[in-house]
Amino acid sequence: MNSLFASTARGLEELLKSELEALGAHDCKIVQGGVHFQGDDRLMYQSLLWSRLASRILLPLNEFKVYSDLDLYLGVQAIDWPSIFGVDKTFAVHFSGVNDEIRNSQYGALKVKDAIVDSFTRKMDQRPTVAKQQPDIRVNVFLQRDMASVALDLSGEGLHQRGYRDLTGQAPLKENLAAAIIQRSGWQPGTPMVDPMCGSGTLLIEAAMMASDRAPGLHRGHWGFTAWSAFNEALWRELTTEAQVRARRGLLETSSRFFGSDIDRRVIEMARANARRAGVAELITFNANDISKLVNPLPEGPVGTVISNPPYGERLESEPALIALHNMFGRMMKTAFGGWRLSLFSASPELLSCLQLRADREFKAKNGPLDCVQKNYQLTANPQGAGGALVAEDYANRLRKNVKKLDKWAKQQGIECYRLYDADLPDYNVAVDRYGSKVVVQEYAPPKTIDPQKARQRLFDVINATLAVLELPSNQLVLKTRERQKGKNQYEKLAQKGEFLLVSEYNAKLWVNLTDYLDTGLFLDHRIARQMLGKMSQGKDFLNLFAYTGTASVHAGLGGARSTTTVDMSRTYLEWAEKNLRVNGLTGQQHRLIQADCLSWLSNTDEQFDVIFIDPPTFSNSKRMETTFDVQRDHLVLMKELKRLLRRKGTIMFSNNKRGFQMDLAGIAALGLEAKEITALTQSEDFARNRQIHNCWLVTHSQEEK
């Protein structure tokens, strides 16, 4: 009787135990990551050949205490290695774990290798060769605290490597995990199965192998036991011959049929090739189709199971498309697959909620480092495809109301970019902005007290509802998360797409970029201020400080300004400003662009201007100041410098975004200036709920100064 250990992915131990017991294993004991069991040689080889769930089958050789590297060396050398494999065989060591003395797995593996080689040298005066690729013998050592376990890895390569999958698409499932997903799905051999997002076909192939009674190890070309001195070749040949007979008979007798599709034709060809190598190609029909064209391949029956591992996305920009995909998929399941079972495996439970289906079973498992969930559903017939209650219904109703009001208003105003929703409801803390045909949803980062998964679920509900209310294709929605920006973060790229969209604002054309930066290049709340600047600038010299993408300069130029001077420290934004000026025909020497720290430039120039627009940051570091710039603390210093540049009858428009900003009117007067707040005049209909989004002032020379 052999003592053996079968390893598996975390979360699959109970399934593996049942499988081993069905094969005839005794004394099965579950531990994290695997199952200890007992069995004779026949059972040992059967587990290697037939286990669909095990990652490896290990034969323990020794277990001992390790308090030093010498203990490790001596414990390994105590094993009679020449009796286990011949000196003409190659070997490799896999070492995992550390303790206070063995702090590096590579060092541990080196000590084990030395002990094995020295054992051969001492007894035979010869040494075996170490091979990293396909060694004849694989030694597995696991160190936990002060206990080391040494085992012979009978698998060789991991058992998930069945031998049929030479080619895969992106993010493939391991074969043993795919087998577990199928077993947990409720699918029964003899019934049909559909995978509408099948990739390279792993789920379908594994199910077809189960249905046709094909041993998962039948196609493997390399094992870890064939160079083992105790290898029973006759018994192994008997078991593999028996497995081949069962596979041929099973292929003829099974009534199961399998259907797979994927949008990628190249991946579908891989899936077909994999199925041929696995010997189950005649059971599976593959098609290259977009999921939107999914139909039930057996509309008249029998009913079966839809099993899939849909894409889940790791990048924020992909989420709207994935949310729309899952929402559409849920509707398809109800319309075309009534009476069937559905089982989906995903790293994103939030995306599964977008199906708007109620799961009746749920399992957890690991897919490599990812925590995943598998949910099973019973699909009820619904030929009309009613979608059920709209998620985030309160949000959807508010958005619908705002859209009806604001779309009409924006058309009358002659603007394409405006805010549709601005955290109107506390449970849905997002801003929704329309930019021509596209929409940007910005999530305000939730407080740390809010459960991240709950916040993510709520955001997904918002996106789902936004797409539905606006009847918007998912590729027209851009998702961003807005957090407080520090230092230069606001200038750093979020993406590298370089996609610009030309939009209209009154008589101006402006370039926006919805993906690459946190902001889009157009501050919507300053729209009326820009319009006012255009009217104020006719025949005037206009200065734009902290100019960003120069949109105020565009309006001033179109308003007939004699000259515009646009100053910003960012080369990126100045190049953007130049594009904005050029598309409006504002070219020539009278339209200057200056890259400089605005505060330093301000203190070093003596030019004169009629209209000055300044929208400084609330807080920043400045080379000119030894400490920092704070708009509340330092606005008088700023005004003193601006006064120098302002012609006698000139006007400064001063704006900032600091909530609760208090203008020092007495200090302004002492400088010989007058300030008048015009915040209410610069706030538009789409920002009516957020009166504190900015404050705005007109500053002129006092009557005495004039």
Curated annotation (Swiss-Prot):
One annotated GO molecular function is:
23S rRNA (guanine(2445)-N(2))-methyltransferase activity
Gene3D superfamilies documented for this protein:
3.30.2130.30, RNA methyltransferase domain (HRMD) like (3.30.750.80), Vaccinia Virus protein VP39 (3.40.50.150)
**Mind naming one GO cellular-component term on file for this protein?**
cytoplasm
Give residue ranges for domain THUMP: 43-154
Q: Give yes or no: UniProt keyword Transferase.
A: yes
Q: Which SMART domains match?
A: THUMP (SM00981)
One Pfam family name is: RlmL_1st
| Enzyme Commission number(s) from the entry | 2.1.1.173, 2.1.1.264
Q: Where in the cell is it found?
A: Cytoplasm
**Main localization of the protein described in the UniProt heading:** cytoplasm
Keywords (alphabetical) are:
Cytoplasm, Methyltransferase, RNA-binding, rRNA processing, S-adenosyl-L-methionine, Transferase
Reactions catalysed: guanosine(2445) in 23S rRNA + S-adenosyl-L-methionine = N(2)-methylguanosine(2445) in 23S rRNA + S-adenosyl-L-homocysteine + H(+); guanosine(2069) in 23S rRNA + S-adenosyl-L-methionine = N(2)-methylguanosine(2069) in 23S rRNA + S-adenosyl-L-homocysteine + H(+)
Protein role: Specifically methylates the guanine in position 2445 (m2G2445) and the guanine in position 2069 (m7G2069) of 23S rRNA.
In the record, the note on similarity to other proteins reads:
Belongs to the methyltransferase superfamily. RlmKL family.
The protein depicted here goes by the name Ribosomal RNA large subunit methyltransferase K/L
Which gene is transcribed and translated to give this protein? rlmL
